[in-house]
Design a protein with these regions (language model features):
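Extracellular and organelle-lumenal recognition/adhesion modules and their flexible linkers in secreted
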Residues: 184, 189, 194-196
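Catalytic core of non-heme Fe(II) oxygenases with the double-stranded beta-helix
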Residues: 102-177, 187
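A short hydrophobic beta-strand segment most commonly corresponding to one strand
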Residues: 122-123, 193-199
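Non-heme Fe(II)/2-oxoglutarate
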Residues: 9-91, 109
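A short coil-to-beta-strand element that immediately follows conserved catalytic motifs
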Residues: 89-99
Length: 199
């Protein structure tokens, strides 16, 4: 429990977000994009069927890449241990429970879903061409806050994002971590290239 007094030292309006959902974004520096892509396409050639969960029109690996050392686990774990586990969490015993590959071909997308049984989920974009599909997060309070959100001016909504959904453009080399309970989807890949990520 936290109690925080609002100091009234100025006449300016104060905005205090109550109970926000947090999204963490990290840039992976100097990652071997071509090496990772070679590894990913070799995995695809080994198991071209993959599995279907939320993906439509694309390929998702059926292998658990946390079971043994591999370049995918190495780059994600190295980044998260330094930037997320140690600097953000109070417990150091968090670990990556599952890791899979996503190849969203042109025209592919992912239905809205979340990840029960996990605390945090995330995505690392390895190849993210322009127009390859936004990552869309649904506001879990969109129904109960609908009238409140529609009452705010456009200017205020820009200051403090209070929208029914949050849209994020994928960026190569970025890892995004978010609460597993939040429903999210991937929009249609409207580019002519594969959008490739690991989650």
């Amino acid at each position: 429990e936290t109690c925080q007094d609002v100091e009234d030292e100025t006449d300016e309006m104060k905005i205090i977000p109550l109970f926000p959902s947090t999204l963490h974004a990290y840039t992976v520096k100097d990652f071997d994009k071509e090496g990772l892509l070679d590894y990913i396409y070799a995995e695809y050639d080994f198991d071209p069927e993959g599995r279907t969960i939320s993906n439509r029109g694309g390929w998702q690996s059926s292998v658990d890449y946390t079971a043994e050392d591999n370049p995918l686990l190495d780059v994600v774990e190295r980044t998260l241990r330094h930037d997320f586990f140690f600097r953000t969490l109070k417990h150091e015993d968090f670990h990556i429970e599952d890791l899979w590959i996503n190849i969203n071909r042109p025209g592919a997308f992912n239905h809205k879903h979340n990840h029960p049984g996990s605390v945090f989920s995330g995505v690392f974009w390895i190849n993210a061409p322009k127009d390859s599909g936004l990552l869309v997060f649904d506001n879990p309070n969109a129904f109960t806050m609908w009238d409140e959100m529609n009452s705010y001016s456009d200017e205020f909504q820009k200051i403090l994002p209070v929208h029914p959904a949050y849209y994020m453009t994928p960026k190569e080399g970025m890892i995004v971590i978010f609460p597993s309970s939040i429903y999210h989807k991937v929009d249609l890949n409207e580019s002519v290239e594969n959008r490739i990520s690991i989650s």
